[in-house]
């Protein structure tokens, strides 16, 4: 019984093998034939599309206006150059339009092609109005994509790196904000022939990759879109504009400029607490702080374009410079009105005492010599003896002479001007900082959106 079952199983497996293997080969041949047929059909469609196609003529020539729908995907934004007033942006630039000459029928609805086909059909002659330099990436092949739908709608995408102008108004620098435009349109076709339209709304027509910001000194606040028409001697042209809104980060400038300026002003006010007679020390404080402020003002301007107006940082540095220079002038004023105490307070009193003692000693010596010379005669003459005794006897009621008071030394005296400066200078500088930072930090960013 078991032997019969094994025989039946072997026969069944042999039957399946003999039947399935030819069927598999037939299916493989059918799929291969279908692939070959698809390639053949694909080639025939392309050949038929290009048969008699003139890529020198725009779609709808003499009949309708060609509408080009555009949108931008930003893969990298930055860096931004303040000195050159320009920025660099890396984008996928997408254009979409309809060409009735490229309609087709076939087993597929979309033909996915590369850059080779793009050179054989009409494409918009788009250029960037404010672009200084534009590069189309060609590694390892030209980064271009072309898709043709069966109704003649084309999608043309390319990867570009654009270096564009960004006009900046630096009155509020470094608390400033800017709107950098990216303008593009047709170079040869006027609005009566080709017009551009944003594909989506503002948030979708221009998108920035989440990790696309390459900015060290700015925050990318967002973007907006616009459209305008410009007139020239050759006609009216459509110009599409995308604005990228930037707000400068102030941290770098606080560390590099603001804090050193504040510390320099505070250092200049330390001289008010030194003795007014300490001329060398106060002179070093004044001259050093003035030179430091000069160096800071020069270095702060190196990273900026040579504009003809003063920025917010320039005003801050100018006021700090005024405080430092005023401290030096204050010392000069105090020094001018300071009396030299060591020239008359101490030495003149000592010299007067020495002169007085010398005159007394001379008088005593003369008196002693006279007494010695006349002593024998005094002893002989009773009248002279009596007169001598009466002359040498001091008067009991004579009051001692008052000694002249020593002049008060003024070596460690403090000037009234210094006392006032210790209060006035810090209060004024603190008030200035309060008004300055409250004004600029609470101000809404003004984005100069050019038309």
Swiss-Prot record:
Activity regulation: Activated by pentobarbital. Inhibited by the antagonist bicuculline.
Gene transcribed to yield this protein: GABRA2
Domain notes: The extracellular domain contributes to synaptic contact formation.
Subcellular location: Postsynaptic cell membrane; Cell membrane; Cytoplasmic vesicle membrane; Cell projection, Dendrite
CDD domains: LGIC_ECD_GABAAR_A2, LGIC_TM_GABAAR_alpha
PROSITE patterns tied to this protein: NEUROTR_ION_CHANNEL
Post-translational modification: Glycosylated.
Glycosylated residues, chain numbering: 38, 138
Major localisation: membrane
Signal peptide interval: 1-28
Species in which this protein is naturally found: Homo sapiens
Keyword S-adenosyl-L-methionine: no
Topology in the lipid bilayer: Multi-pass membrane protein
Name used for this protein in its record: Gamma-aminobutyric acid receptor subunit alpha-2
Cytoplasmic side: 271-280, 333-420
GO MF: benzodiazepine receptor activity; GABA-A receptor activity; GABA-gated chloride ion channel activity; ligand-gated monoatomic ion channel activity involved in regulation of presynaptic membrane potential; transmitter-gated monoatomic ion channel activity involved in regulation of postsynaptic membrane potential
């Amino acid at each position: 019984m078991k032997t019969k079952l094994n025989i039946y199983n072997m026969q069944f497996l042999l039957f399946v093998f003999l039947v399935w293997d030819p069927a598999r080969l037939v299916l493989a041949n059918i799929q291969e034939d279908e692939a070959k047929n698809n390639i053949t059909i694909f080639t025939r469609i392309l050949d038929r599309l290009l048969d008699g196609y003139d890529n020198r003529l725009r779609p709808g020539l003499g009949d309708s206006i060609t509408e080009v729908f555009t949108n931008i995907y930003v893969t990298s934004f930055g860096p931004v150059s303040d000195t050159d007033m320009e920025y660099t942006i890396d984008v996928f630039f997408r254009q979409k339009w309809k060409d009735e000459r490229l309609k087709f029928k076939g087993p597929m609805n979309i033909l996915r092609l590369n850059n080779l086909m793009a050179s054989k059909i009409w494409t918009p002659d788009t250029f960037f109005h404010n672009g200084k330099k534009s590069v189309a990436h060609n590694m390892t092949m030209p980064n271009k994509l072309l898709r043709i739908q069966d109704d003649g709608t084309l999608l043309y995408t390319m990867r570009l790196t654009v270096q564009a102008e960004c006009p900046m108004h630096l009155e509020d620098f470094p608390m400033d904000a800017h709107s950098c435009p990216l303008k593009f349109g047709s170079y040869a076709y006027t609005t009566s022939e080709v017009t551009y339209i944003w594909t989506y709304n503002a948030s979708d027509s221009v998108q920035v990759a989440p990790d696309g910001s390459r900015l060290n000194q700015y925050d990318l606040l967002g973007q907006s879109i616009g459209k305008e028409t410009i007139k020239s001697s050759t006609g009216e042209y459509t110009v599409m504009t995308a604005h990228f809104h930037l707000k400068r980060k102030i941290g770098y400038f606080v560390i590099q400029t603001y804090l050193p300026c504040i510390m320099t002003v505070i250092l200049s006010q330390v001289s008010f607490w030194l003795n007014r007679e300490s001329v060398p020390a106060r002179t070093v404080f004044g001259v050093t702080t003035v030179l430091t402020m000069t160096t800071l003002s020069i270095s702060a301007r190196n990273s900026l374009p040579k504009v003809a107006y003063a920025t917010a940082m320039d005003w801050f540095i100018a006021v700090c410079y005024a405080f430092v220079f005023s401290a030096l002038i204050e010392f000069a004023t105090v020094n001018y009105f300071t009396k030299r105490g060591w020239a008359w307070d101490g030495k003149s009193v000592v010299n007067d005492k020495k002169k007085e003692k010398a005159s007394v000693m001379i008088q005593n010596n003369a008196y002693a010599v006279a007494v010695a010379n006349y002593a024998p005669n005094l002893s002989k003459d009773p009248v002279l003896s009596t007169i001598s005794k009466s002359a040498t006897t001091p008067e009991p009621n004579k009051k001692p002479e008052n000694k002249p008071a020593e002049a008060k030394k003024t070596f460690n005296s403090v000037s009234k001007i210094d006392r006032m400066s210790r209060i006035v200078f810090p209060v004024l500088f603190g008030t200035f900082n309060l008004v300055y930072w409250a004004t600029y930090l609470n101000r809404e960013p003004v984005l100069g959106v050019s038309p």
